[in-house]
Amino acid sequence: MLSPRRINGLYKAEPKIDYELISVLRERTGVPIVMHGGSGLSAKEYRECIVRGVQKINYYTYADKAALEGAKQFLAEHPETYVFAPVSVVVGRAVEANLDELVQALYEGQLNR
């Protein structure tokens, strides 16, 4: 696995990707590049990483954040909730919506052809 200047979690400053490093490593090694973390990247930045050789993106923080926001909103609207089951449904939908958004961004213009 290669992580070209990436760290996990939310960032205080804008993340910077070394695109040239991704290209060089992919070209010289011939092995697939894994991006460990993609928090804060735009759709354009994700696509540029893919074009340069990233073949796997480990994605968690923003999906986890969407889950938490979904749970908080549900509990605010339903304060009488006393078990987790209904919260888990909302959490699952929030994560699914977040991942759908990511997939649409990554494959913009390529899906539904």
Please place each PLM-identified region on the residue numbering:
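Glycine/Thr-rich beta-alpha phosphate-binding loop at enzyme active sites
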Residues: 1-20
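Alpha-helix-loop-beta-strand connector modules within alpha/beta enzyme cores
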Residues: 14-35
